[in-house]
Regions:
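N-terminal Sec-pathway targeting helices
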Residues: 1-19
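Membrane-interface motif at the C-terminal end of an N-terminal transmembrane signal
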Residues: 14-34
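Metallo-beta-lactamase
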Residues: 27-46, 139-209, 214-217, 294-322
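Conserved beta-strand hairpin/beta-sheet module of binuclear metal-dependent hydrolase folds
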Residues: 44-99, 202-225
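Pre-active-site segment of Zn-dependent metallo-hydrolases
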Residues: 66-112, 117, 122-126, 187-196, ...
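Active-site neighborhood of phospho(di)ester-bond hydrolases with catalytic His/Asp-centered motifs
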Residues: 70-71, 107-116, 136-138, 221-224, ...
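Binuclear metal-ion centers of metallo-dependent hydrolases, dominated by the metallo-beta-lactamase
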Residues: 134, 146-163, 256, 260-337
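Active-site-proximal loop/helix segments of hydrolase catalytic cores
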Residues: 193-261
Length: 337
């Protein structure tokens, strides 16, 4: 009994120290000033390919006719303790609907998911249902969609490397790896429709992908998690990389296997914010997991690569020089094949 009591006290003390450390890191937010100093702004123009970032690796790409949303995550269940205790969570549909309304998103052609952890995939089925979109991702992502009530006719399980055409977007999912020594726990697959509420750890990894999006105005690579499959991106090209920067342990190697392999000279860091905080609070780097200061220090050693950051929820034209003058903006569906 004494031993058990001692272990319990030790655990409580360690949790208390962790809470203090997390609170301190949240106040310090190392690297946040550098992030703000690299802000990229280019006002949206008719016909332009634009990007809007919504925290973590959630990214909206649209060109006035068609729109795709990658890794939507608006619910953001609050607090670290529920995450540690693996409590039950579920998509907050009213919050999702409000976020879509604020973002002027009433219709999407496709929702893409890079892997099936909750911070990338939990909201995906609901977003697809609310916007009339197809859901594209792994078999695990498909089961998240089914759990949200999305019919199979609106779900497409992707095969690595296959080209998928959505309007003027050409999309390819490339097999990758999750960041971190654990390989991305919880690993494994979601093998049946995931009904919610479900626990954090029910959102198993499934496949992990880089997503290449090609468009007549330019090409972007969405690399949401800071792992990589050696050589997987060889022979591909992207002008710009949206690069996940959580759990980076070897930045030079990471850049070689992502940014350098695709020949990009522009990088936008994503997946750095504390997603246990709601989007209506100021963003902070995720404590103990993200060191923006180290990322920017490392990028200073690669001056040929331009680091640009996006303001939360603010739309920006990605390739201003490629925008046709006076191009009309219109709404339309997608041809997917």
């Amino acid at each position: 009994m004494k031993l058990l009591r001692g272990l319990l006290i030790t655990v409580l003390v360690l949790l208390g120290l962790l809470a203090v450390a997390v609170a301190w890191l949240r106040t310090q937010a190392p690297g946040l000033e550098a992030y703000r100093a690299h802000r990229y702004e280019a006002a949206p123009r008719p016909g332009a390919l634009t990007a809007t970032w919504y925290g973590v690796s959630a990214l909206l790409l649209r060109d006035g006719e068609h729109a795709i949303l990658i890794d939507p995550f608006f619910t953001r269940p609050e607090g670290l303790l529920p995450l540690v205790l693996n409590r039950a969570i579920e998509p907050d549909e009213p919050r999702i609907a409000a976020a879509l309304l604020a973002a002027r998103i009433d219709k999407l052609d496709a929702v893409l998911v890079s892997h099936s952890h909750y911070d990338h995939a939990m909201d995906a089925g609901v977003v697809a249902k609310l916007t009339g979109a197809m859901l594209l991702g792994s078999a695990s992502t498909a089961n998240i969609g089914r759990g949200a009530g999305l019919p199979d006719g609106r779900i497409r399980r992707v095969e690595p490397g296959e080209p998928i055409t959505v309007g003027r977007f050409r999309i390819r999912f490339i097999a990758s790896r999750h960041a971190g020594a654990s390989g991305g726990r919880p690993t494994g697959d979601i093998t049946a429709p995931l009904r919610t509420p479900a626990h954090y750890l029910d959102y198993k990894l499934g496949g992990t992908y880089s997503i290449l999006v090609e468009h007549p105005q330019g090409s972007v690579l969405h690399h949401g998690s800071a792992g990589w499959e050696p050589g997987a991106l060889a022979g591909l090209h992207a002008d710009l990389v949206f690069l996940g920067v959580a759990l980076v342990d070897d930045l030079p190697a990471y850049l070689r296997e992502t940014v350098d392999l695709v020949g990009a000279r522009r990088v936008v860091p994503v997946h750095w914010d504390d997603f246990t905080l709601p989007l209506d609070q100021p963003l902070r780097p995720f404590p103990l997991v993200v060191r923006l200061d180290r990322f920017f220090a490392g990028m200073a050693q690669r001056p040929e690569i331009q680091v640009q950051t996006l303001e939360l929820g603010r739309e920006a034209t990605l390739f201003p020089a490629s925008v046709p003058s006076g191009a009309p903006a219109s709404a339309g569906g997608a041809e997917m094949r």
